Regions:
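Short loop/turn segments at beta->alpha junctions
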Residues: 2, 35-38, 169
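A short helix/loop element that forms part of the nucleotide-sugar donor recognition site in Leloir-type
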Residues: 3-10
Length: 213
């Protein structure tokens, strides 16, 4: 019934849009839709993974991921998928995505992005290792797309790539994460005190630079 009303619900939201399951990782079930028929197909596919589906307005810009460890910014990396969308295939197919560090943005803009990421993580009460994904448009807008407190930790994942660019190799990064976890434990910080497990924000309602004080 809800699918039959999809056009009405979508209304004047516009296209293109990004469709994804609420609780999946690695962009599993994510798709870009250019019209109502594509939206319907994408929603049906996403429902195979989760009973709740997010539809976000597509915003064109430069995708920059920022790595943090215990509130400290490690660095940033620019993501350039050849397909135009950083989906599951772009993440795990060799050669499908170009990773550029430092990002090809003015240095003042990169610092602004990293500052925004740091404030977003702090506002959400994040601790330990996390990754903040930011979309930088041609204008003055910087959108927080996602704060991921369970970032990939294979040697080729983004957080280790960012750490490597900062001179921190994979074993040292793992040790730093463990040291931080031990410190939090000694201070009596429980998992319940870490208020955020995974947050995704629709692009048109995302944090902008002026929203975080």
């Amino acid at each position: 019934k809800e699918l039959d009303e999809l056009n009405e619900v979508h209304g004047s939201f516009g296209f293109p849009v990004i469709v994804k399951p609420r609780s999946e990782g690695s962009s599993v079930g994510m798709a870009r839709a250019e019209n109502f028929e594509g939206l319907r197909r994408a929603v049906l596919a996403a429902l195979d993974h989760d009973p709740f589906v997010l539809v976000e307005r597509f915003v064109k810009g430069t995708e920059v991921h920022v790595g943090l460890l215990d509130g400290r910014v490690l660095g940033a990396i620019e993501i350039v998928p050849k397909s135009g969308i950083y989906d599951y295939a772009s993440k795990y197919t060799p050669g499908a995505t170009e990773y550029i560090t430092p990002p090809r943005l003015p240095s003042t803009r990169v610092r602004g992005v990293m500052n925004l990421a740091e404030r977003a993580a702090r506002a959400l009460g994040c601790s330990g290792a996390c990754r903040v994904d930011v979309l930088v448009t041609e204008g003055e807008n910087e959108y927080v797309l996602e704060v991921n407190t369970l970032p990939g930790m294979t040697p080729t994942s983004l957080l280790p790539k960012i750490a490597s660019s900062a001179g921190i190799d994979y074993p040292a990064l793992c040790e730093a994460i463990l040291d931080g976890a031990t410190l939090h434990g000694s201070l009596g910080v429980s998992r319940r005190d870490s208020r955020i497990s995974h947050v995704t924000v629709a692009a048109d309602a995302a944090f902008e630079s002026d929203d975080l004080e």
